Design a protein with these regions (language model features):
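Conserved positions within compact, well-structured domain cores
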Residues: 1-171
Length: 171
């Protein structure tokens, strides 16, 4: 789904991407992403982000679908995950991904992140990488939002807000 949207999209083998909202042919683009090109001041003024600089519940896909306290993680939480875990490329139930295992005070925690990418990121090989939205817009680019990138590298990055990335809810 595009960043700041809550209705989502699903794959359709015959016609590409189909919007769940209206079930018509759909393509991720700048024109159909309401947050694209808006700086943080505009996002805050229009009610997309709060005083902390993260998506409000009404525009948080995890909260919209699962209810509170579920939400999208922030880029700071993605950075903490990277800094406090070891990561191992593995497979669970036939799905490739990264197993994040906590270190130190977090040693009893782990999370599996499937290697999945969204709609407009066809340059990344399926089943070999993952791109997950954060709730944080990129502060230096009014067209981007923060992501957790799982590819040859494992890092916090950014992606065009209209890209169809996936959401990994947290609480």
């Amino acid at each position: 789904m595009s960043w700041g949207e809550t209705f989502g999209c699903k794959g359709n083998a015959q016609c590409g991407w189909t919007s769940v909202k209206d079930l018509t042919s759909f393509s991720f683009s700048e024109g159909n992403c309401p947050t694209y090109g808006k700086d943080n001041f505009q996002l805050k003024a229009e009610g997309y982000i709060d005083a902390t600089g993260n998506l409000v519940a009404a525009h948080d896909a995890a909260t919209a679908h699962l209810g509170a306290p579920w939400r999208m993680p922030t880029t700071a939480e993605f950075e903490a995950l990277i800094n406090n875990c070891t990561e191992t490329w593995t497979q669970r139930n036939g799905v490739n991904g990264r197993l994040m295992t906590g270190r130190g005070a977090y040693a009893s925690n782990s999370i599996f992140l499937p290697a999945v990418v969204g709609g407009s990121t066809s340059q990344y090989p399926r089943n070999l990488c993952g791109l997950y939205w954060s709730s944080t817009p990129a502060s230096d680019y009014s067209t981007d939002a923060g992501t957790l990138n799982l590819y040859y590298y494992f890092q916090v990055g950014r992606s065009d807000r209209y890209d169809g990335q996936v959401v990994r809810p947290v609480r």
